[in-house]
C-alpha cells in the first residue's frame, strides 16, 4: 500500500516537472522567435513591405522563369514565398546567376539568396547561411552515345562547369584523389553548358544531380556515379544574421 502511494506521488511529481519543462521550453522558443522578428534586419523588411529574394531562372524544379506564364516556379521559389508569407510581406523575385548572386548580396539588392547555394567553409566565412534545406551530390550529364558510363571514363576529357560555382574546385580535388585528369570549360549559364554538350565542345556537363535532371533528354543521361554531398542553404550578408536565424526557425 505504501509502495503504491509512493509510486503515485512520484508519477504525479514527474508529470508536473515535465509540464513545467514543456511550458518553459515553448515560452523560450516563442521569446526567441519574437526577438528575431523584432530585430533590425527583419523589421527593415517588414517596414518596407517587400522581401527581395535572389532566385535562379534556369534551374527546372528549383528556380525557373517561365516565359509562357511570366512567373517563377520551383521549390526555392516556393520557399521564398513561404518566408514572405510568414513575415506578412510581398516577395520580389530577382534573377541571379552563379556570378551575380554574391555581388547582389554584397550591395544589398537582395535580402536573401535561395539559389542552389552550396554551403562550404569559405562561404560561411563571408556570408550568413542557414541550415541546409536540400541535400545533393555532384554528377555528370553526358550524351548517351558517348561511351561514357562512369567517372573514370572522363579521364583526359573536357568537362563543362558553371562560372562562379564550387563545382570546378570539387572536380579538381576528386581528380587529384583518384589519379585522373580533367580539362575544363567554364560558361556563364546552365543552358550554355547544355548546348556545349550537344555541340560536342565538352564531353560532360557537371553540376549537382538535381540541376542536371532538368536538362536530361532522349539524347543524354546522368551518370549513376556521383560524388561529394552538397548542402544547399539560404544566404545573406553577415549584417542579416538575425534574418537567417529567423529563416532557420521556418526550415
PLM segments and residue spans:
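Sec-dependent N-terminal signal peptides of Gram-positive bacterial secreted proteins and lipoproteins
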Residues: 2-28
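Extracytoplasmic small-molecule ligand-binding "clamshell" domains
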Residues: 31-115
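Extended ligand-binding regions for polar small-molecule ligands
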Residues: 31-36, 77-86, 148, 152, ...
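A structural signal for short loop-to-beta-strand junctions that line the ligand-binding cleft
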Residues: 42, 74-76, 124-133, 221-225, ...
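Ligand-binding cleft/hinge of the Venus flytrap
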Residues: 65-69, 80-89, 167-186, 217
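Acidic, polar ligand-binding/catalytic clefts
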Residues: 81, 85, 90-153, 220
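A ligand-binding cleft/hinge motif common to bilobed small-molecule-binding domains
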Residues: 100-103, 117-125, 170-175, 191, ...
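Periplasmic-binding protein-like
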Residues: 135-142, 209-251
Amino acid at each position: 500500500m505504501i509502495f503504491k502511494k509512493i509510486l503515485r506521488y512520484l508519477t504525479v511529481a514527474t508529470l508536473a516537472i515535465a509540464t513545467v519543462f514543456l511550458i518553459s521550453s515553448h515560452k523560450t522558443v516563442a521569446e526567441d522567435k519574437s526577438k528575431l522578428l523584432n530585430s533590425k534586419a527583419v523589421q527593415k523588411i517588414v517596414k518596407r513591405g517587400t522581401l527581395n529574394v535572389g532566385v535562379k531562372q534556369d534551374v527546372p524544379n528549383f528556380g525557373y522563369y517561365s516565359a509562357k506564364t511570366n512567373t517563377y516556379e520551383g521549390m526555392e521559389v516556393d520557399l521564398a514565398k513561404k518566408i514572405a508569407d510568414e513575415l506578412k510581406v510581398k516577395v520580389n523575385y530577382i534573377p541571379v546567376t552563379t556570378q551575380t548572386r554574391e555581388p547582389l548580396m554584397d550591395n544589398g539588392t537582395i535580402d536573401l539568396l535561395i539559389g542552389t547555394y552550396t554551403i562550404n567553409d569559405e562561404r560561411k566565412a563571408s556570408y550568413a547561411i542557414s541550415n541546409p534545406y536540400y541535400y545533393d551530390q555532384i554528377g555528370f550529364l553526358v550524351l548517351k552515345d558517348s561511351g561514357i558510363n562512369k567517372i573514370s571514363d572522363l579521364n583526359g576529357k573536357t568537362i563543362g562547369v558553371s562560372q562562379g560555382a564550387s563545382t570546378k574546385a570539387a572536380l579538381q580535388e576528386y581528380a587529384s584523389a583518384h589519379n585522373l585528369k580533367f580539362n575544363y570549360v567554364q560558361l556563364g549559364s546552365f543552358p550554355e553548358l547544355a548546348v556545349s554538350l550537344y555541340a560536342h565542345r565538352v564531353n560532360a556537363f557537371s553540376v549537382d544531380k538535381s540541376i542536371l535532371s532538368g536538362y536530361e533528354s532522349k539524347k543524354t543521361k546522368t551518370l549513376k556515379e556521383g560524388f561529394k554531398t552538397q548542402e544547399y542553404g539560404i544566404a545573406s550578408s553577415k549584417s542579416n544574421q538575425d534574418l537567417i536565424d529567423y529563416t532557420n526557425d521556418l526550415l
